[in-house]
Each structure stands twice: as C-alpha cells, then as structure tokens.
Amino acid sequence: MEYTLDIYTKQPEQLMQRMAQNCKARRLERGYSRRTLSERTGVPAPTIERFETTGKISFESFCALVVEFDYFQEMSQILSMPKYTTGSELETIHRNKKRQKGR
C-alpha cells in the first residue's frame, strides 16, 4: 500500500484517501474488524467501511477514530501554528494575531 502524497497536487481528495488508508492500516494492525472498531468508537460499521473505501467521513466520526488509535496529541497540533510561504503572509499573520473575527 503506497502512502505518498504528491506535494505539487495538494488535493483534499488525496488527503482524505490517505487518511482512510492510514486508518484502515491501524485497524488491521490491532486486529479489529470494522464491527469491533464500531463498538469501541460508536462510529457505525457502514460509516467506517465508506471511509475506508471513499475517504469520506464526518469530522466527529474521524475524531472518534483518532482518539481510539491514540493520535489525539498529533491531531491537536494540526493548525496550532501559523504557516506562511512569503514574507507578506508572515507580516499579515503578525498584524492579525490579536484579531477575534475575520473580515
């Protein structure tokens, strides 16, 4: 199973599929059936099957899987720090740091 993500074609669908593949790999490593994972997380088995085949799942259900596989800390770090690619973006980030609302 290939786990590469082409950084030049950053498509949400690719990320969703990669997360689904990774989740399935973690499930199989633990020896869980979809039914067992469903019982442990409260995520319906058909939802898990759809996620593993299409990459589509609600964020709430995805978070339940993340917690079950003990990736809470890693997930909580996503979007925790600003990212920028240009000096202009960095200036905007610093200027807007104290803002509470978008425009």
Place the predicted regions along the sequence by residue.
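Amphipathic alpha-helical protein-protein interaction surfaces
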Residues: 53, 71-74
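A short, Lys/Arg-rich alpha-helix, primarily the initiator
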Residues: 2-28, 78
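Short, basic-rich loop-to-helix N-cap that marks the start of a DNA-contacting helix
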Residues: 54-68
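Short basic helix-loop element that most often maps to the first helix and adjoining turn
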Residues: 21-36, 95-102
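Helix-turn-helix DNA-binding elements, focusing on the entry/boundary residues of the two helices
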Residues: 23, 34, 45, 59-62
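Short alpha-helical DNA-recognition segment
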Residues: 31-49
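Short, charged recognition helix plus adjacent turn
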Residues: 76-103
